[in-house]
């Protein structure tokens, strides 16, 4: 039992190297601004102009969610070429997370009975762990995401009593659980790599 507590016990070096760790996350984030910005520009264009109108004509507002991410991607991609605009690094990635992960959480909640769209949210839940966010920040994004998803379900009442919908919801819950574990592992790995640099 003591070994288990030691495994989850917070490393005292965390507090000592908090600023250095955040600085290292910002450095990693700066390297991802351009590729993530480009991906954001093109990721949802086909959905917005082609698939969404055919699959969910009752939800025309979905187009604006898609275009908002494209606009955010254009801004991030452009800003990444200007030193004054790109900031320390994480700021622009926070912007992309809001327009992709959080907006997807809300509009997927509205059409949560569509397993295809729920699977798209599952992809974002997992891939967001690869972004060099601080663990606490990522958990905040997860909490907001879950809140927005549930709020949209309560507001729009999609039919979730079918076997397909229940199966899809189970997979979504699992994706959040896996995301939490992956985020924790990656956070420990990033911090360990930083400490190893100090010890070299």
Predicted regions and their residues:
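Alpha-helical transmembrane segments and their helix-membrane boundary motifs
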Residues: 26-42, 58-67, 132-143, 164-172
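Hydrophobic transmembrane alpha-helices and their membrane-interface boundaries in multi-pass
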Residues: 35-128, 145-147
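Interfacial aromatic-anchored transmembrane helix boundaries in multi-pass membrane proteins
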Residues: 149-172
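Membrane-interfacial segments
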Residues: 54-55, 59, 85, 156-160, ...
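Juxtamembrane or sensor-core-proximal signal-transducing alpha helices
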Residues: 173-200
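Non-catalytic regulatory/interaction regions at protein termini and inter-domain linkers
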Residues: 1-28, 39-44, 55-57, 93-95, ...
């Amino acid at each position: 039992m003591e070994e288990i507590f030691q495994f989850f016990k917070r490393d005292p070096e965390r507090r000592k190297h908090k600023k250095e760790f955040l600085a290292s996350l910002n450095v990693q984030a700066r390297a991802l601004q351009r590729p993530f910005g480009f991906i954001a520009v093109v990721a949802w264009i086909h959905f917005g102009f082609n698939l969404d109108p055919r699959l969910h004509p009752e939800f025309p507002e979905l187009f604006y969610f898609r275009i908002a991410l494209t606009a955010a991607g254009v801004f991030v991609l452009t800003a990444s070429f200007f030193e004054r605009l790109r900031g320390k690094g994480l700021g622009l990635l926070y912007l992309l997370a809001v327009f992709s992960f959080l907006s997807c959480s809300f509009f997927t909640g509205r059409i949560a009975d569509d397993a295809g769209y729920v699977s798209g949210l599952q992809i974002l839940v997992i891939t967001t762990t690869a972004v060099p966010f601080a663990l606490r920040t990522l958990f905040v994004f997860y909490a907001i995401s879950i809140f927005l998803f549930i709020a949209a379900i309560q507001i729009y009442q999609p039919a979730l009593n079918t076997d397909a919908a229940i199966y899809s919801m189970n997979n979504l819950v699992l994706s959040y659980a896996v995301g939490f574990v992956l985020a924790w592992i990656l956070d420990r790995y990033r911090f360990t790599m930083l400490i190893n640099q100090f010890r070299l």
